[in-house]
Design a protein with these regions (language model features):
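Phosphate-binding site recognition
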Residues: 1-174
Length: 176
C-alpha cells in the first residue's frame, strides 16, 4: 500500500512551470525521493508528459557516479533535451555534486526545463538554501509521516501502531 502525500504533491503541482528551481528538503528517510520519483512522476505521466521528457538522476547511486561531476551532469542533461518541448528534471540528492548551484543556475537559462531537486544534508536543511539560487529557488519542506499517514499503511491494530510510531517516529522506511 502506498502512503498518500497529497499535500506535498499539491505543492509541487502549484509550483510546476513557475521558472524556479523547486528545492525539496527534509531529513533523511522522510520520503523526498519517493515523492519526486514516484508520486510526482506519476502525476506528470498521467497528465500528458511523455516519459522521454522526464529526466531522472539519483546522484547517490553508484550508477550515476560520473554525473556527480558538474560539467558531465550539465552535458548529460543538455543532451537529453532533444526538442523545444518542456522537460522535467528530477534530480535526487544534489548535494553529492560539487558546485551544484552553478549547474542549476545554468539549467534555469534553458527555458524548456523545469527543475526539481532533493537534498538532505545540513546545508539543505538550513533556511538559507533558497537564497543560494539568488531568488530563483522555491523550497518545499517535507516532514516525517504524521501518525495518520503512518497508520494508513500499518499492518496491525491502532494501539500497536501508536506504540511503534512513538518508538520509530514517522520514518518512511519503517512502514515498508
Amino acid at each position: 500500500m502506498e502512503i498518500k502525500r497529497d499535500a506535498y504533491l499539491q505543492q509541487l503541482i502549484e509550483r510546476k512551470d513557475n521558472g524556479m528551481i523547486k528545492v525539496i528538503t527534509g531529513i533523511r528517510r522522510c520520503g523526498k525521493s519517493f515523492l519526486l520519483f514516484t508520486i510526482f512522476k506519476r502525476y506528470l505521466l498521467e497528465n500528458g508528459i511523455g516519459s522521454d521528457h522526464i529526466i531522472e538522476i539519483a546522484l547517490d547511486g553508484i550508477e550515476n557516479e560520473e554525473l556527480r561531476d558538474p560539467k558531465m551532469c550539465f552535458k548529460y542533461i543538455k543532451d537529453a533535451v532533444k526538442d523545444d518541448g518542456k522537460y522535467y528534471l528530477l534530480l535526487d540528492e544534489v548535494q553529492f555534486m560539487p558546485r551544484f548551484e552553478e549547474v542549476l543556475n545554468s539549467l534555469l537559462r534553458m527555458s524548456n526545463i523545469d527543475v526539481y531537486v532533493t537534498g538532505s544534508n545540513s546545508r539543505f536543511l538550513s533556511s538559507d538554501i533558497v537564497t543560494e539560487f539568488r531568488g530563483r529557488g522555491d523550497e518545499i519542506r517535507i516532514y516525517p509521516l504524521s501518525f495518520a499517514e503512518f497508520y494508513s499503511v500499518y499492518d496491525g491494530d491502532y494501539d500497536d501502531a501508536w506504540d511503534d510510531y512513538m518508538i520509530y517516529g514517522g520514518s518512511v522506511s519503517y512502514t515498508h
